[in-house]
Curated annotation (Swiss-Prot):
Positions annotated to bind S-adenosyl-L-methionine: 35-37, 55, 79, 100, 107
Record keyword Transmembrane helix present: no
Name of this protein: Ribosomal RNA small subunit methyltransferase H
Organism: Burkholderia multivorans (strain ATCC 17616 / 249)
Pfam families (UniProt xref): Methyltransf_5
EC top class, as a word: transferase
GO biological process: rRNA base methylation
The encoding gene: rsmH
InterPro entries to which the protein is assigned, alphabetical: RsmH, SAM-dep_MeTrfase_MraW_recog, SAM-dependent_MTases_sf
Recorded family membership: Belongs to the methyltransferase superfamily. RsmH family.
Main location: cytoplasm
Length: 313
């Protein structure tokens, strides 16, 4: 319960203010977490409004089931299933989609979940521990090349190859040492390889991020849900996305820019600008946490929120 109480929703008021444009609309919270955004959205909706939330984490589902509001429903699945899940409920268009990306404080702070290098625990890292392959299972079979690519591409770690070599060497000792199945040992292996220190960062930060992203297919799911949100939004509907690292933010930024720009046409062709299809999105802007919020919640420091609005039906 203590971890539940420690969780602070980032950019709470700003996100809900940007998202909810009509109190009778249908809204989607793609990442329920511990319900901060969902509760705030419900507080702004009228009797006819609806909110459908998604989460992969069974503990988030337990929390959501305690809300007890007829306007609210929860889906135990990735937000990548949004299009199909809403279609199954007869919903074709929504007034807004909110995505609060990344891992939540209760997940990080619970050593049993395997997300943190600060306390020893089982090497799991799955948002939903009942589905898919754990971090330990993946590390036990991944090739040197796959390890290198994941740590380099998802962790932006310049020592990716050296870390991957150390992990393969550790795996070769499994008969003598047992499997690599604890966060503490993984952090120790990375710490022995990464000798340089980034200010305020543990040497294992990038590797843990990379493995977590891979195990949970976070970036692939993000691309799927952005495409789904674009097709689901009604005219005037809002897409609000909060990201916490550059990989996520880059995908969101490029997606919004790509769909807020008129199609490129060879100037030699006899086509007038008014004859071109209008871009489907308008970029509203981006926001960062205030100094006061960062002081109260240091984990908010890296957050950036991007907002776009659907222009066309």
């Amino acid at each position: 319960m203590g971890n539940e109480l420690q969780h602070r929703t980032v950019l709470l008021d700003e996100a809900v203010e940007s998202l909810v444009t009509r109190p009778d609309g249908i809204y989607v919270d793609g990442t329920f977490g511990r319900g901060g955004h969902s509760r705030a959205v419900l507080a702004r909706l009228g009797p006819a409004g609806r909110l459908i939330a998604f989460d992969k984490d069974p503990r988030a589902i337990e929390t959501a089931q305690g809300i007890g509001d007829a306007r609210f429903s929860i889906v135990h699945d990735s937000f990548a299933s949004m299009r199909d899940a809403l279609a199954a409920r007869g919903i074709e268009k929504v007034s807004g989609v909110l995505l609060d990306l990344g891992v939540s404080s209760p997940q990080v702070d619970d050593p049993a979940r395997g997300f943190s290098f600060r306390a020893d625990g089982p090497l799991d890292m799955r948002m939903d521990p009942t589905r898919g392959e754990s971090a330990a299972e993946w590390l036990a079979r991944a090739s040197l090349q796959e390890l290198t690519e994941v740590i380099r591409d998802y962790g932006e770690e310049r020592f990716a190859f050296q870390i991957a070599k150390a992990l393969v060497a550790r795996r070769a000792e499994s008969d003598r040492l047992g499997p690599l199945d604890s966060t503490g040992e993984l952090a120790q292996i990375v710490g022995h390889v990464v000798k340089t220190r980034e200010k305020g960062k543990d040497p294992a930060t990038r590797t843990f991020q990379a493995i977590r992203i891979h195990v949970n297919q976070e970036l692939a799911d993000l691309q799927v849900v952005l495409d789904a949100a674009l097709s689901l939004l009604e005219q005037g509907g809002r897409l609000v996305v909060i990201s916490f690292h550059s990989l996520e933010d880059r995908i969101v930024k490029r997606f919004m820019q790509a769909h807020a720009s008129a199609p490129a046409v060879d100037r030699r062709l006899p086509i007038r600008a008014v004859d071109l299809p209008s871009p489907p999105l308008k970029i509203i802007g981006r926001q960062f946490p205030s100094e006061a919020e960062v002081a109260a919640n240091p984990r908010a420091r890296s957050a950036v929120m991007r907002i776009a609005e659907r222009l066309t039906p």
